[in-house]
């Protein structure tokens, strides 16, 4: 529908930001949006590729806490629960002040309880 087309346009715009300003702090924002696009389409593998690229190439990008959280969610959706737990733990350790750290903590506790 129309919202899907708008989303696609926005995605392309963010992709452009990512490609044109690879050293910018805005990369985190662009990457978070690109990955959200893939997540919404349930293309978790592509979202994971985007997350892995930003974590290796832009360790100082903005929104890394959100990126780690969503990375963990994608791994979880793909039944890669031990890896998902690692990402949530990384978020908790690296960004203890983040608003989503407590949510990540709940997920880690649940994963541990389930044996992951």
Predicted region positions:
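Acidic, polar-rich low-complexity tracts and alpha-helical solenoid repeat scaffolds
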Residues: 1-116
């Amino acid at each position: 529908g129309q919202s899907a087309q708008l989303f696609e346009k926005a995605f392309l715009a963010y992709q452009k930001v990512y490609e044109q300003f690879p050293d910018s702090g805005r990369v985190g924002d662009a990457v978070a949006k690109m990955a959200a696009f893939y997540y919404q389409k349930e293309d978790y593998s592509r979202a994971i590729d985007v997350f892995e690229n930003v974590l290796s190439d832009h360790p100082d990008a903005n929104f890394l806490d959100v990126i780690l959280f969503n990375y963990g969610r994608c791994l979880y959706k793909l039944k890669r629960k031990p890896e998902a737990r690692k990402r949530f733990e990384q978020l908790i350790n690296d960004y203890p002040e983040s608003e989503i750290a407590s949510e990540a903590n709940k997920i880690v506790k649940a994963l541990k309880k389930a044996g992951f």
